[in-house]
Amino acid sequence: MTPREQDRSQPLSQGRFPGRVGRRVLRPLALAVTLGVLAIVLSGCSSWADALALGWPKGITPQAHLNRELWIGAVIASLVVGAIVYGLIFWASAFHRKKATDTELPRQFGYNMPLELVLTVTPFLIISVLFYFTVVVQEKMLHIAKDPEVVVDVTAFQWNWKFGYQKVNFKDGTLTYDGADPERKKAMVSKPEGKDAHGEERVGAVRGLNTSDRTYLNFDKVETLGSSDEIPVLVLPTGKRIEFDLASADVVHTFWVPEFLFKRDVIPNAEANNSIHVFQVEEINSPGAFVGHCAEFCGTYHSMMNFEVRVVSPNDFKAYLQQRMDGKSNAEALQAIGQSPVAVTTHPFDSKRGQLAGSQ
């Protein structure tokens, strides 16, 4: 009697048929469960693009849209490669398992030159395509154009933010403003450390000066300063190229607005440390309120180092800036253009802090 005939002669009590029947039932059941879970997950997405973005924000700048499209393209490429690889693994496991009657090794492909070439060249082609599109998007995101229409000074400190308008120059000529405050900047220059008890000159850490030298920081006439009582709101116009000049007054921070799909480290004295401290957005194409964070662990209250970007129309921005130049507080200027005077996107933190006495 052959082994197959012996197997068929086993009674049901030995479990031959139940095992096979169980496997036949479990496979379709597992497939149905997988498809059901996938359907539930995808049903919560408004489109395939949202599903493939895997939680990425939609973005409010042209650079953000390019970055999101690059991410979605990489996800699609990964899914295609994964489907092929896992499909082949499943196919080999399901249809080419060793049988009880097999006595020889299956056909080997160790010296199949065409197959080896395909398996070697294909990954390099995939990497090359992804590398090309990554470089293209990166160049557009890091591009610094001459004469941006709005220049914002961003100063990070433990554990809050200061925003100032260094320069505003709309190309249509409707608003020109120079907001730099050089006198306050000069006041940050420290004096040499002098001589020690032996009459020798003390050499400081910064060009022979003491470490309180902060001449790399920028100061402006119109500023919004965050504090324990105020979550700072940075007001920006739509449709204008905006430059952010970043500096830290103490430790390393990171300026991150998730809807920009971009973040950059904020470093003390960045130029002396050969670090890039400027980036631009081509324009912001969606008005609204957008939360911002520090994305670099910077100490005890790092998690509360939030801010808000409030995007308004160019006309509202001009009215807001005029209010600030007239001496109004940030909250009062926001109220004057019909905006909430306090942050509305910094949940779960108290968004009502910052309601200044004059606007309560």
UniProtKB/Swiss-Prot annotation:
The keyword Cell membrane appears for this protein: yes
Signal peptide feature range: 1-39
Keywords assigned by UniProt, alphabetized: Cell membrane, Copper, Electron transport, Membrane, Metal-binding, Respiratory chain, Signal, Translocase, Transmembrane, Transmembrane helix, Transport
Domain of life: Bacteria
Keyword Transport: yes
Entry-linked PROSITE patterns: COX2 (PS00078), COX2_CUA (PS50857)
Cofactor: how and how many bound: Binds a copper A center.
Membrane topology field: Multi-pass membrane protein
Main subcellular localisation: membrane
Entry's localization field: Cell membrane
Catalytic reaction(s) noted: 4 Fe(II)-[cytochrome c] + O2 + 8 H(+)(in) = 4 Fe(III)-[cytochrome c] + 2 H2O + 4 H(+)(out)
Annotated EC: 7.1.1.9
Family membership: Belongs to the cytochrome c oxidase subunit 2 family.
Entry function: Subunits I and II form the functional core of the enzyme complex. Electrons originating in cytochrome c are transferred via heme a and Cu(A) to the binuclear center formed by heme a3 and Cu(B).
Protein name (database record): Probable cytochrome c oxidase subunit 2
